[in-house]
UniProtKB/Swiss-Prot annotation:
InterPro entries: DNA-dir_RNA_pol_insert, DNA-dir_RNA_pol_RpoA/D/Rpb3, DNA-dir_RpoA, RBP11-like, RNAP_asu_C, RNApol_insert_sf. Homodimer. In cyanobacteria the RNAP catalytic core is composed of 2 alpha, 1 beta, 1 beta', 1 gamma and 1 omega subunit. When a sigma factor is associated with the core the holoenzyme is formed, which can initiate transcription. It comes from Synechocystis sp. (strain ATCC 27184 / PCC 6803 / Kazusa). The gene is rpoA. Residues 1-228 are annotated as: Alpha N-terminal domain (alpha-NTD). One of its GO terms (biological process) is DNA-templated transcription. It is an enzyme of class 2 (transferase). Keywords: DNA-directed RNA polymerase, Nucleotidyltransferase, Transcription, Transferase. This is DNA-directed RNA polymerase subunit alpha. Belongs to the RNA polymerase alpha chain family. The N-terminal domain is essential for RNAP assembly and basal transcription, whereas the C-terminal domain is involved in interaction with transcriptional regulators and with upstream promoter elements. Its EC number is 2.7.7.6. It catalyses: RNA(n) + a ribonucleoside 5'-triphosphate = RNA(n+1) + diphosphate. It comes from the Bacteria. Residues 243-314 are annotated as: Alpha C-terminal domain (alpha-CTD).
């Protein structure tokens, strides 16, 4: 089996602790660069687990459109700032973080009290600004998940009162690009070089993300290795599919009226038509005797297929 090499050719930490790395994978057979690159990109962006704030509770607040005395931001703005909070959770169980801040001053993520199972990635992340004498008391729930969770209600009925749900972004990988280059090694036939650029929010290193994505893809295909058993179980079965049944109804060259009626009835191919008897055709809305005769004649002349006159008896 041909082996390819993986090399990290560039790596850096950017603002807000965001991580970036560039990887090179080579040599790959022609066409495999696009196949591997596309699969990795989709899994990196959609299937890796991450942590996010899913709900908050602020003292004296019972809806997201409220304001807090002495706090520059209203509750909705605070919720948006909490949505952008980058966290890492080492447990699958929901965790509760807390904040008690008294003005004047700026509130950042560094002031949060979080369990040992939760890590705040960027302590400088801005939350709110408090005036003299203002007080902000808050609890927030941290959960692990995959992808993006959209709330359906303003309150979390499964939790304590006054907890306000937040649209949660769990995706630790923020951006992925890939390019495929042509290479020639030792005078051999042309090969592919896959260049993969990965950006993360800082809760995971790009090399860790690439490793996890590769595991997910590999595990996805493991069941396909046992197809021999499937073949043995079905060795005596012959699935006889008439290729003519897969022909779209456009090939029958019907009149516009008959064609539109069939389309509205979700009849898109000859296979769909074969589920109907001649009586069934007449029951289609706006499908008269003339249209039915046209379809029956087209099937007979073009494909040698004759529809049964009556519905099959149960």
């Amino acid at each position: 089996m041909a082996q390819f090499q993986i090399e990290c050719v560039e790596s850096s930490t950017r603002k807000n602790q965001q991580q970036y790395s560039k990887f090179s994978l080579e040599p790959l057979d022609r066409g495999q660069g696009t196949t591997v690159g596309n699969a990795l990109r989709r899994v990196l962006l959609s299937n890796l687990p991450g942590a996010a704030v899913t709900a908050i509770r602020i003292a004296g607040v019972n809806h997201e459109f409220a304001t807090i005395l002495g706090v520059r931001e209203d509750v909705l703005e605070i919720m948006l700032n909490m949505k952008e909070l980058v966290l890492k959770s080492y447990t699958d169980q929901p965790q509760i973080g807390r904040l008690t801040a008294i003005g004047p001053g700026t509130v950042t993520a560094a002031q949060f009290e979080v369990p040992s199972e939760v890590e705040v990635i960027d302590p400088n992340q801005y939350i709110a600004t408090l005036a003299e004498g203002a007080k902000l008391e808050m609890e927030f729930r941290v959960e692990r998940g995959v992808g993006y969770r959209v709330i359906e209600r303003g309150k979390d009925e499964n939790s304590s009162l006054d907890f306000l749900q937040i649209d949660s972004v769990f995706m630790p990988v923020t951006k992925v690009n890939y390019t495929v280059e042509d290479i020639r090694a030792d005078g051999m036939s042309p090969k592919d070089r896959l260049i993969l650029d990965i950006w993360t929010n800082g809760s995971i290193q790009p090399r860790e993300a690439l490793s996890e994505a590769s595991d997910i893809i590999a595990n996805l295909f493991i069941p396909l290795k046992d197809l021999n058993e499937l073949e043995a179980a079905h060795s005596d079965y012959q699935d006889e599919v008439n290729p003519e049944s897969q022909i779209p109804i456009e090939e029958l060259q019907l009149s516009v009226r008959a064609y539109n009626c069939l389309k509205r009835a979700q009849i898109n191919s000859v296979a769909d038509l074969l589920e109907y008897s001649q009586e069934d055709l007449l029951e289609i809305k706006n499908f008269g005797l003339k249209s039915a005769e046209e379809v029956i004649e087209a099937l007979q002349k073009r494909l040698g297929i004759t529809l049964p006159h009556e519905k099959a008896k149960a």
